[in-house]
Each structure stands twice: as structure tokens, then as C-alpha cells.
Amino acid sequence: MHSSIEEMYDFQDKGGRHLALRPEQTASVVRAFAEHRPNIPWKAWYTGPNFRYERAQKGRLRQFSQVGVEALGTEDPYLDVEVMALAWRFYERLGLSQIKLEINSLGNKDDRVLFI
């Protein structure tokens, strides 16, 4: 598995500035949360193009759009339910009717120790 840095388009522009195209958006949201310490729980949404420097393959393009929501700063499971309900309504409003929701859980800290 490659890191986002390895998959990042980076280059110098005509002015000699070093630029990079974002490979995904979650890291930027988490960084903003860590730097600005907003009130919690903190909810954010984003949408936009992303770029990955990798061999193009079926279902994995170099440029793609990402829509996402993040809810940070709490372990309240109701916030997870809120995010799932938001996604469900989003797909419904797009007119998608053949949606199947499968829910799984990593468990809590004690549960995960059993799988290490």
C-alpha cells in the first residue's frame, strides 16, 4: 500500500514554486481540527477533485471527485448514526433506489486486542 505522499502529484510551476495536488481530503480536515481546536463534536463536509499519481487502472483513476463528511472529537456512537443517516439521505436525493446498508463495527479497545 502506498502513502498519500508517494501518490502525490508534485512539481515546480513557472515561477519556481513547489506545488502539489491533493490526493485526498480527509487529512486536511483532520489537520484543521488539530490546529484550530474547534468546539466538539466538530462536523465538517467537503467535496472536490483529487489527484493521485499512480498507474491508471479500472475503477481507480488519476483524477476523481470525493464527497465526504467527518465528525470529530467524540466517541458518541449516535454521531456515527447521524453520519450514516446523512449518507442515506444523500443517496436517496440522488435518486438511487438500489442501496444496501451494511453495518459493521471494530468494537471497542478491549475487543480489538483479541484480533492482534
Task: State where each predicted segment sits.
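TRNA-recognition modules of translation machinery and tRNA-sensing kinases, especially anticodon-binding
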Residues: 1-116
